[in-house]
């Protein structure tokens, strides 16, 4: 310490302690900074004695100056300290560090006569290589010369490596020492390292790799002129094949300089970083602060690991700002988050000093109380009781024993008794056991001591003085007086009773104001007429409020609480009005975080703390009508199972879940036992299949399991489990008898013991639905009281997530546990998860990510069908986060009808697929949580095996992935499959997130629109973007719509004999060529395909092919990309080779040109030629109205093939394909309405959902008034009971709502792109615009053409339900509805009559029977299960009047009746 003590002495040391560390800061320099600087100098090979003089400090600054821009924080601090010491030695006055640096800078500029400024240490910037004053390459007289490295620099480098042993400090140390060096100098530094040859070898390998990459990227340009400097190779940069002079020339030549020194330094840094990672394998993500570890120690470890990270400065800066705070312990994290955004390291270290001590915790609690005042106040525990102040030391009033000046007396300062101290005084305990009556007979306020009588310090069940009997007698007397007073006020003041009734929250047996603990009990009180918000705190002895002026008649008091001691003013006999009751009590005013009423006022108000026990009401369950319970015999069981079942039943009986069945119970269900997963314990199972058949049906309330990707990102998560979930739900008493079962005995040694369930049993079909319903009812108040909490409940698994503090989050979890425990649900501690990772629903959750729990694929020698099914199930489960999982070939192993135990023979493709899946599963994948404010996106990709994969993400964060490989058709088209994939993703997104994502599809827009022309039903697909990730979905061949001029035309045909299965396929061309092939074991369709394949194979690059097979035309027009048919795949391969191909269809056997010739060629005139009439009138009809296929077929009697060909040959109708009609499940009165736009006009469209009938017209503006007028027109023409629209402003306007109310229309609204929304009218808008485009030239104005198009669509378009036009279908539905209503009305009248009748010669009257129908000559009567036809003359019809029936004695009873009823 000698040298260190001699650095600054006497006045110089005093001057040091006057200089501030920061401008305007409080901290100043101390001698410890000098000691630290002396230690740091040794690291740089500098003697600490240099600090003793001005010249020595100047030498230090000269060495440190070039290292500051790229140096560490320690280096900058050392530089700053030396600047301050220099100023003291030079007798330069400096107030702080910055001023000292400025003075040093001016001095250095004056001495070196240069304008260069000292680098700033606050924001390091890397200087360009070669710009400095102390570098090995220096400019002398305009020439660059090389100065070898000094021994001090080499010694500092060797010492750094030896001390740190390739720690994280080696990389920045090398950067600083090698700044401006040539490769020669860097090799000299590496050669100085004697040990650590393994690390040196790693560096050499990195150098070789980088040199090879350099050579590959910079090829030799060719021979150079004599005397010209060559370009450096990789070995030149490494210094092995180049001289120092060449290196300097490359670095500093005027044109195209190559900084070989900087490049070589970067290579070495890569190698050093690799060595650091090898010598220090700790990941920075694993650097976390221990519970009791000082924050400074944690920061040291963090930065040491940070230096070893191989990443750019931006990422390191992010790690510093994020991970340093995130991985701190909870105490430090709470402090750091209070510092705001991006605090400095010094601020962090200062704030976290002493974290964890009692003082810091008290400060945190006080601050938390103050922060919580605005949103929701939290209780503040007041100090010790000081109501009736009497000194137990001297016996005088007016002061306490603490303030007494008399000599101390032994004993308790609270009660004055000996044997204990005040902290353990029994009088300080608060008892809240209720003595008074509970229920509806209770008074307005719960019973308690009389505020004017009993001492408010005493508790209801523990007297402070006097015998217990006297206290209880006084309490009962006060209670009787209070009840009588309230009863008198009720009799005299009805308003008082009404006011009290309104204050009661619900009827749970306590007729008094009740405060739910779902939130803090805060009420408004008036203190001497001044309103204040106060917290009712049963844990506080005194009452303290702030902001109230009560005058000067007070006594000063000091009370203690969580936040420390508070100076207060105590006022006695203050009038307080709260909850419509007035009392006088003692209250204090002071600087309290929250206003509280303690027990002194609560007791005076007559309040008490009660715990009402809630009860789950059982739900009434019945058997199906006419069914009885199960009566099955118990099958034999092994002795081991019987003993296990006996033990289980005895335990369940003790816990109240079972009870013995009475001997009168006739029902029984077999029971048995199986081993649990651990193979040590048994599980009781009961075969409730028979009981499930006869039990009434239930509805599953929760249809699916929640997905972690749908959870919002929260800071804190807790997972808990409801133990014995079903066994916590009581079973209705009337149903318990049906759950009876019997425990048999060995050898029938004794009668079996019979039990019935008192709770919902496992295996019974009603347990899940009842449990779900009950849990929803239980948790509903909790959800409403905590809207910021995410509560996910699926069966017995509960997840709670929030952004609250640890304390608040744990408090909410504790409230939930207490709620469940209070209702009889257990929450076992072994399944309570407070710290990540959380095991939940098969997932592994973390606060910022989620994963699947570990997936282990089975390893088997012999695989059965059941094993493959389980394997595929596991892989499908993994596919939600592991992209690339495939199961197609595995599923093919178990195609067909196979038993579960049948052995499976593996194929090579299936084995390869399984191995590929194993590789995918070996790489762990993570998912992220949903952020509602960000856009939801879905990216779809297609692999080479026609399997589709997709990921749903928000930016770069993946929420989940999935796959799709369903191929429903033999011949598939990639675009059609893509539409199916989008539909699946859309449905999945609606279920999980309730919104449709934006799609990124691997298809070109032209390809999509070309296919969409024929399959326009996919127009509901929302916004999508094209992505160029191969393989793209393409239409593989160019199918043109018009005949190709100059190309050869092929007419194809095929035929087959159904008996012999022999056939022919062939073609004939317009150029005289023909070809026929004999086929065996074929079909007509196969023969047609063979003929088409022959034509495609034998044709040139362009061809016209005419077919008469609708089957072939349908396959080719669909443009399949692959097929399971060998012939179709051959056709696809051949058509890909064609430049263009035109395919058309003509009706078979119509005598059409080459088609007739090829028909004779392949069938030799066997077929009969039919000529169809009325083709021309049908074509004229279509050209005028553009009718659809079914309308032409119906009106002109044409086959559908011919009618479809007429439509297909129409250029306008060919723009969009024929609609694929489906059945819409809709009521008669349901309409959908929407507005669309055309040519700048607004068209309002209404569609009858069930029939497709359309009403449309042009409106001047899209307003509520115009929409309401159109709705009135619509309602005046057609029956309408339900109108469905989107949520546009015109449809949600008051005018439309008023019209809907006046007419009696139920109005509902949908959302865009929802398949269950306004899809019918959206599609009809599309139809209407297409129809208008076909006939647009027939009218001038939009108003006219809209009405003409509506006429065509309603009367000229046939198809759908009933093969009718929309107008016919709507009228048919209206008339059918009227007829049904008439018949139902008539049948309901007939049901009011009974028939007595005679049969044959039997003179006895029989009956009564139920009248089904009454005709002119006979009636139809139902008697029991028989239906009889009785002549009118043998039947007597009477009306059923309930309890009185009159016989019809004459035919006049069937005519006019007094009540007007006629049978």
From Swiss-Prot:
Domain of life from the UniProt record: Viruses
Residues annotated as site: Cis/trans isomerization of proline peptide bond: 222-223
Lipid-substituted positions (N-myristoyl glycine): 2
Listed cofactors: Mg(2+)
Zinc-finger ranges (CCHC-type): 389-406, 410-427
Stretches for region Dimerization/Multimerization of capsid protein p24: 279-365
Alphabetized CDD domains for the sequence: HIV_retropepsin_like
GO CC list: host cell; host cell nucleus; host cell plasma membrane; host multivesicular body; membrane; viral nucleocapsid; virion membrane
Catalytic activity: Endopeptidase for which the P1 residue is preferably hydrophobic; Endohydrolysis of RNA in RNA/DNA hybrids. Three different cleavage modes: 1. sequence-specific internal cleavage of RNA. Human immunodeficiency virus type 1 and Moloney murine leukemia virus enzymes prefer to cleave the RNA strand one nucleotide away from the RNA-DNA junction. 2. RNA 5'-end directed cleavage 13-19 nucleotides from the RNA end. 3. DNA 3'-end directed cleavage 15-20 nucleotides away from the primer terminus; 3'-end directed exonucleolytic cleavage of viral RNA-DNA hybrid; DNA(n) + a 2'-deoxyribonucleoside 5'-triphosphate = DNA(n+1) + diphosphate
The Integrase catalytic domain, residue ranges: 1223-1374
Record's protein name: Gag-Pol polyprotein
Keywords, sorted A to Z: AIDS, Aspartyl protease, Capsid protein, DNA integration, DNA recombination, DNA-binding, DNA-directed DNA polymerase, Endonuclease, Eukaryotic host gene expression shutoff by virus, Eukaryotic host translation shutoff by virus, Host cell membrane, Host cytoplasm, Host endosome, Host gene expression shutoff by virus, Host membrane, Host nucleus, Host-virus interaction, Hydrolase, Lipid-binding, Lipoprotein, Magnesium, Membrane, Metal-binding, Multifunctional enzyme, Myristate, Nuclease, Nucleotidyltransferase, Protease, Repeat, RNA-binding, RNA-directed DNA polymerase, Transferase, Viral genome integration, Viral nucleoprotein, Viral penetration into host nucleus, Viral release from host cell, Virion, Virion maturation, Virus entry into host cell, Zinc, Zinc-finger
Gene name of this polypeptide: gag-pol
Region (Interaction with Gp41): 7-31
Chain segments carrying region Interaction with human PPIA/CYPA and NUP153: 191-228
Domain Peptidase A2 residue range list: 532-601
């Amino acid at each position: 310490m000698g040298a260190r003590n001699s650095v600054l002495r006497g006045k110089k040391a005093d001057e040091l302690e006057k200089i501030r560390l920061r401008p305007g800061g409080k901290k100043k320099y101390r001698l410890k900074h000098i000691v630290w600087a002396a230690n740091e100098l040794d690291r740089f090979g500098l003697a600490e004695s240099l600090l003793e003089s001005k010249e020595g400090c100047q030498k230090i600054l000269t060495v440190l100056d070039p290292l500051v821009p790229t140096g560490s924080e320690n280096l900058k601090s050392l530089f700053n300290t030396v600047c301050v010491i220099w100023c003291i030695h030079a007798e330069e006055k400096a107030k702080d560090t910055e001023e000292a640096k400025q003075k040093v800078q001016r001095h250095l500029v004056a001495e070196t006569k240069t304008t260069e400024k000292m680098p700033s240490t606050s924001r390091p910037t890397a200087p360009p290589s070669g710009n400095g004053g102390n570098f090995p390459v220096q400019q002398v007289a305009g020439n660059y010369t090389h100065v070898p490295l000094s021994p001090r620099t080499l010694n500092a480098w060797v010492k750094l490596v030896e001390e740190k042993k390739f720690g994280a400090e080696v990389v920045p140390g090398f950067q600083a020492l090698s700044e401006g060096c040539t490769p020669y100098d860097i090799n000299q530094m590496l050669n100085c390292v004697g040990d650590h040859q393994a690390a040196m070898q790693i560096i050499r390998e990195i150098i070789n790799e980088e040199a090879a990459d350099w050579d590959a990227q910079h090829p030799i340009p060719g021979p150079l002129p004599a005397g010209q400097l060559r370009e450096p190779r990789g070995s030149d940069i490494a210094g092995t094949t180049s001289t120092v002079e060449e290196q300097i020339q490359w670095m500093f030549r005027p044109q195209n300089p190559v900084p070989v020194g900087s490049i070589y330094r970067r290579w070495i840094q890569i190698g050093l970083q690799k060595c650091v990672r090898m010598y220090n394998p700790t990941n920075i993500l694993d650097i976390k602060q221990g519970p009791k570890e000082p924050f400074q120690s944690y920061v040291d470890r963090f930065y040491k690991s940070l230096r070893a990270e191989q990443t750019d400065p931006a990422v390191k800066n992010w790690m510093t700002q994020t991970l340093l705070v995130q991985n701190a312990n909870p105490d430090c994290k709470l402090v750091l988050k209070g510092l705001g955004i991006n605090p400095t390291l010094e601020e962090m270290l200062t704030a976290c000093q002493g974290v964890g001590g009692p003082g810091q915790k008290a400060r945190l609690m006080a601050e938390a109380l103050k922060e919580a005042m605005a949103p929701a106040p939290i209780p503040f525990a007041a100090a010790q009781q000081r109501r009736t102040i009497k000194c137990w030391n001297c016996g005088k009033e007016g002061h306490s024993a603490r303030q007494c000046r008399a000599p101390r007396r032994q004993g308790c300062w609270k009660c004055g008794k000996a044997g204990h101290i005040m902290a353990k005084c029994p009088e300080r305990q608060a008892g809240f056991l209720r003595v008074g009556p509970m229920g509806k007979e209770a008074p307005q306020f719960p019973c308690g001591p009389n505020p004017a009588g009993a001492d408010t310090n005493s508790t209801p069940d523990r007297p402070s003085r006097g015998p217990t009997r006297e206290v209880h007698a006084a309490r009962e007397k006060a209670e009787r007086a209070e009840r009588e007073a309230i009863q008198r006020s009720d009799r005299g003041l009805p308003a008082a009773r009404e006011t009290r009734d309104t204050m009661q929250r619900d009827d749970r047996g306590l007729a008094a104001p009740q405060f739910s603990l779902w939130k803090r009990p805060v009420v408004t009180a008036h203190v001497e007429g001044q309103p204040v918000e106060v917290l009712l705190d049963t844990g506080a002895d005194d009452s303290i409020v702030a902001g109230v002026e009560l005058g000067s008649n007070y006594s000063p008091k000091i009370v203690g609480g969580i936040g420390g001691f508070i100076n207060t003013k105590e006022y006695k006999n203050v009038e307080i009005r709260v909850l419509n009751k007035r009392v006088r009590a003692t209250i204090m005013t002071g600087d309290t975080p929250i206003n509280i009423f303690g027990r002194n006022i609560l007791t005076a108000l007559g309040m008490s703390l009660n715990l009402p026990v809630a009860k789950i009401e059982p739900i009434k369950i019945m058997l199906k009508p006419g069914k009885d319970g199960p009566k099955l015999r118990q099958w034999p069981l092994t002795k081991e199972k019987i003993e296990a079942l006996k033990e289980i039943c005895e335990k369940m009986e003790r816990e109240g879940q079972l009870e013995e069945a009475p001997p009168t119970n006739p029902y029984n269900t077999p029971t048995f036992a199986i081993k649990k997963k651990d193979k040590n314990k048994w599980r009781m199972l009961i075969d409730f299949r028979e009981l499930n058949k006869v039990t009434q049906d239930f509805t599953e309330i929760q249809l699916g399991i929640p997905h972690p990707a749908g959870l919002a990102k929260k800071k804190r998560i807790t997972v808990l489990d409801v133990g014995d979930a079903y066994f916590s739900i009581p079973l209705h008493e009337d149903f318990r008898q049906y759950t009876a079962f019997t425990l048999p005995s060995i050898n029938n040694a004794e009668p079996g013991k019979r039990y019935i369930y008192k709770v919902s049993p496992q295996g019974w079909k009603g347990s899940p639905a009842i449990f779900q319903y009950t849990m929803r009812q239980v948790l509903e108040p909790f959800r409403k009281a905590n809207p910021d909490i995410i509560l996910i409940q699926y069966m017995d698994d509960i997840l709670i997530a929030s952004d609250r503090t640890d304390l608040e989050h744990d408090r909410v979890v504790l409230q939930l546990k207490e709620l469940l425990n209070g209702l009889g649900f257990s929450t076992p501690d072994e399944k309570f998860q407070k710290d990540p990772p959380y095991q939940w629903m098969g997932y592994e959750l973390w606060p910022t990510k989620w994963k699947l729990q570990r997936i282990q694929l089975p390893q088997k020698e012999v695989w059965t069908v059941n094993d493959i099914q389980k394997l595929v199930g596991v892989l499908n489960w993994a596919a939600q986060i592991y992209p690339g999982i495939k199961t197609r070939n595995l599923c093919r192993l178990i195609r067909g009808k196979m038993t579960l135990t049948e052995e499976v023979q593996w194929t090579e493709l299936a084995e390869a697929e399984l191995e590929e899946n194993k590789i995918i599963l070996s790489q762990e994948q993570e998912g992220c949580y949903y952020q509602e404010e960000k856009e939801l996106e879905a990216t779809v990709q297609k692999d080479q095996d026609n399997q589709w994969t997709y990921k749903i993400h928000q930016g770069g964060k993946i929420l989940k992935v999935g796959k799709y490989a369903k191929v429903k058709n033999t011949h598939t088209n990639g675009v059609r499959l893509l539409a199916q994939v989008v539909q699946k993703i859309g449905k999945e997104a609606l279920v999980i997130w309730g919104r449709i994502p934006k799609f990124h599809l691997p298809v070109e827009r032209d390809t999509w629109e070309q296919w969409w022309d024929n399959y326009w039903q996919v127009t509901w697909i929302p916004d999508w973007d094209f992505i160029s990730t191969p393989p793209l979905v393409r239409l593989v061949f160019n199918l043109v719509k018009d005949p190709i001029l100059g190309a050869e035309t092929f007419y194809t045909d095929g035929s087959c004999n159904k008996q012999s299965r022999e056939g022919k396929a062939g073609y004939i061309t317009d150029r005289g060529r023909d070809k026929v092939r004999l086929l065996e074991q074929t079909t007509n369709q196969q023969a047609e395909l063979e003929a088409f394949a022959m034509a495609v194979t034998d044709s040139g690059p362009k061809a016209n092919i005419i077919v008469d097979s609708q089957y072939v035309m349908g396959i080719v027009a669909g443009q399949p990309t692959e097929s399971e048919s060998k012939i179709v795949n051959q056709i696809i391969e051949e058509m890909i080779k064609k430049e263009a191909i035109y395919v058309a269809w003509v009706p078979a056997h119509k005598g059409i040109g080459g088609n007739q010739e090829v028909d004779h060629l392949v069938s030799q005139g066997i077929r009969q030629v039919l000529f169809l009439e009325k083709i021309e009138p049908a074509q004229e009809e279509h050209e005028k109205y553009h009718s659809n296929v079914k309308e032409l077929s119906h009106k002109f009697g044409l086959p559908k093939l011919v009618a479809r060909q007429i439509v297909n040959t129409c250029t306008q109708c060919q723009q969009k394909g024929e609609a694929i009609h489906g059945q819409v499940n809709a009521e008669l009165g349901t309409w959908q309405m929407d507005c669309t736009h055309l040519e700048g006009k607004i068209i309002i469209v209404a569609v009858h959902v069930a029939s497709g009938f359309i009403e449309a017209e042009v409106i001047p503006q899209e307003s509520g008034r115009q929409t309401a007028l159109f709705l009135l027109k619509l309602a005046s023409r057609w029956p309408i009971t339900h109108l469905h629209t989107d949520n546009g402003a015109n449809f949600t306007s008051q005018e439309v709502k008023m019209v809907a109310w006046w007419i009696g229309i139920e109005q509902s609204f949908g959302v865009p792109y929802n398949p269950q929304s306004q899809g019918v009218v959206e599609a009809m808008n599309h139809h209407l615009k297409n129809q208008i485009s076909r006939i647009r030239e027939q009218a001038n104005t939009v108003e006219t053409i809209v009405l003409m198009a509506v006429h065509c669509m309603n009367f000229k378009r046939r198809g759908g339900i009933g093969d009718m036009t929309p107008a016919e279908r709507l009228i048919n539905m209206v008339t059918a509805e009227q007829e049904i209503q008439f018949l139902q009305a008539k049948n309901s009248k007939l049901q009011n009559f009974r028939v007595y009748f005679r049969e044959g010669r039997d003179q006895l009257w029989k009956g009564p029977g139920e009248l089904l129908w009454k005709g002119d000559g006979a009636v139809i009567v139902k008697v029991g299960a028989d239906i009889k036809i009785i002549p009118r003359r043998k039947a007597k019809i009477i009306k059923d009047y309930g309890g009185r029936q009159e016989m019809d004695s004459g035919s006049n009873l069937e005519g006019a009746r007094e009540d007007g009823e006629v049978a």
